[in-house]
Amino acid sequence: MITQKMKYALKALLELADEARRDSPQALTIEEIATRSGTPKRFLEHILLDLRKAGVVASIRGRSGGYSLLKAPRDVSISELVRRIDGPIAPLPCLSRSAYQPCDDCHDEAACRIRKVFAEVFWSYLVLIDSLTLEDMLAAGNPAAKLLED
């Protein structure tokens, strides 16, 4: 499950991506992003800082400053964002790529039936989320994209 913070980050990125597609894109202020996305401004400031540190958005100072998308939507990996914003995504610590820890109550990882079942579910999830980009999320809200698929 993704956190509310991650949902806010995705909403902000979708607004920035929509703005980047306009004929004359402008940097968006935190207020504009908050209004367009329905995200509380007080959370957005911290989230945009995290996204800037991750190299996904740029901040521009000055009168016409604000935030803009630094990468093309197809180059923004959703799984990398989830890990950056929410931390490890594995359902068990013994399945985590980045924060592996053996389970305290497990004596034999290779024979653990709980691990085996959740590993199968998790790997299926990883195949999907590792291939997901911001571009995919933009297309999900576009009725024309569905027509092109048929």
UniProtKB/Swiss-Prot annotation:
It comes from the Bacteria. Keywords: DNA-binding. It holds the Pfam family Rrf2. The keyword DNA-binding applies. GO terms for molecular function: DNA binding; DNA-binding transcription factor activity. Residues 1-139 form the HTH rrf2-type domain. One of its GO terms (cellular component) is cytosol. SUPFAM superfamilies: Winged helix' DNA-binding domain (SSF46785). NCBIfam families: rrf2_super (TIGR00738). This is Putative HTH-type transcriptional regulator rrf2-like.
